[in-house]
A protein has these predicted regions:
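Non-catalytic interaction surface on structured domains
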Residues: 124-128, 132-145, 149-232, 237-244, ...
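Short glycine-/polar-rich loops that comprise or flank the Walker A/P-loop
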Residues: 22, 62, 83-86
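Active-site-proximal helix-loop elements at catalytic-domain edges
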Residues: 6, 16-38, 91-117, 159-164, ...
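Accessory RNA 3′-end/elbow-binding domains used by RNA modification enzymes
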Residues: 2-30, 36-53, 57, 123, ...
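Acidic, low-complexity central loop/insert segments
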Residues: 72, 78-136
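Glycine/acidic-rich beta-strand-loop module
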Residues: 50-80, 138-139
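Residue-level signal for inorganic ion chemistry
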Residues: 67, 88, 146, 234, ...
Length: 384
């Protein structure tokens, strides 16, 4: 159990505070809920307010979400900058407003042909590996003048986001499928899928009579990238480079730094529909996150030491080396006496209708005697 007991003394006696828990939870976020929904579930399970997460996942996405509580929330700033690994499915041949299956399909013509797997992999190696420039979708959590970009986009306002540099360490194609899907909605099931290195001749012509269907190509990929990379933007840009359009239909984060979805202490969760009445008196149904083992959440947590070791770079040293480091640090610490500031005696200006006299006071008293020197209205006398 991860807890510490703190006590404080007062005039009344010794007061015992409630145990303070600190640590990290690696949660497998379910589809259909936000990252904030998961944080709310952890708050309820631990009965704590000080809970946060590192790296937001879209509602459509699943996978690793690192949640910190107590003093361990300080580690989240380090974790959010770690590189990440994703498994994703990119659908080529259709575009959406959000660059994923949550958005609306944008109008477009059928693709007359589709590239082979080899051609796609060559383009990825040339244009989408290493350091690249990426423009996030307007339906993102990026702030523009203090407001979230997705809020502005939903209000119908024009949002222009600047390109940002990101690093793609790995962009591997695991499988390629050709098939057709409904042309009136995003994320529809792929029908007649064929796993192949390239599309067969006459394949598109065979589905032409089905007016409500559209030929598409799907890629199952693995991407390892720097913090701040949008995988749906990769799907969009890859589709544009191929002249087909593209969007994301599946996204799963499998790793954040040293935190992996395959760790033995990963905590699972699921989405649960809940209906409630809002302030306007209307019934609203939405999903919420529910931890599968909420009563034993602390059993899945990493303690502060293990959390720090997984969050930051560590150097193992022996007991003697640790003692030497402490001794060296103490020897370098010197006390510097603060400098005493010497205040100068102020100069007091006395004004009259026809003369200005400056008198600097001595230690005993201020001199207010008029000057023996007569000056015009543009001169002054200072007595020291």
């Amino acid at each position: 159990m991860i807890s510490t007991m703190t006590t404080s003394k007062s005039k009344i006696g010794t007061m015992t505070k409630k145990p303070e828990h600190s640590g990290l939870l690696v949660i497998d976020k379910p589809q259909g809920v936000t990252s904030h929904d998961v944080v709310a579930a952890v708050r309820g399970a631990l009965h704590m307010k000080r809970v946060g997460h590192a790296g937001t996942l879209d509602p459509m996405a699943t996978g690793v979400l690192v949640v910190g509580f107590g003093n361990a929330t300080r580690l989240l700033n380090y974790i959010v900058d770690h590189n990440k690994t994703y498994e994703a499915t990119i659908r080529l041949g259709q575009r959406t407003t959000t660059d994923d299956a949550e958005g609306e399909l944008l109008p477009g013509e059928w693709a007359e042909s589709f590239p082979s797997r080899q051609a796609v992999e060559q383009l990825i190696a040339e244009r989408f590996t290493g350091r690249i420039e990426q423009v996030p979708n307007v339906y993102s959590a990026i702030k523009v003048n203090g407001q979230r970009a997705y809020d502005l986009a939903r209000e119908g306002k024009d949002v222009e986001l600047k390109a940002r540099p990101v690093t793609i360490e790995e962009f591997n194609v695991r499988q390629v499928r050709y098939g057709y899907t409904h042309s009136d909605r995003a994320g529809a099931e792929l029908v007649g899928a064929v796993v192949a290195e390239k599309a067969s001749d006459g394949w598109i012509a065979n589905i032409a009579p089905h007016e409500d269907m559209q030929p598409v190509m799907e890629l199952d990929v693995t991407v390892t990238c720097s913090a701040g990379t949008y995988i749906r933007a990769l799907a969009r840009d890859l589709g544009e480079e191929l002249g087909l359009g593209g969007h994301l239909t599946m996204l799963r984060r499998t790793r954040v730094g040293r935190f992996s979805v395959n760790m033995p202490n990963v905590m699972s969760a699921h989405a649960e529909s809940k209906t409630f009445t809002n302030r306007e008196g209307m019934e609203v149904t939405r999903n919420r996150a529910v931890l599968d083992d909420a009563d034993h959440a602390l059993d899945h947590a990493l303690d502060p030491v293990a959390s720090a070791a997984a969050s930051m770079s560590m150097l193992a040293v022996s007991e003697q080396e640790a003692a030497d480091l402490r001794s060296d640090a103490e020897s370098r610490m010197t006390y510097v006496r603060p400098r005493r500031r010497t205040l100068r005696k102020p100069t007091i200006w006395s004004l009259s209708s026809n003369v200005r006299n400056a008198v600097r006071p001595n230690r005993s008293r201020y001199s207010t005697e008029p000057s023996n020197q007569t000056t015009d209205t543009n001169s002054y006398t200072r007595r020291t």
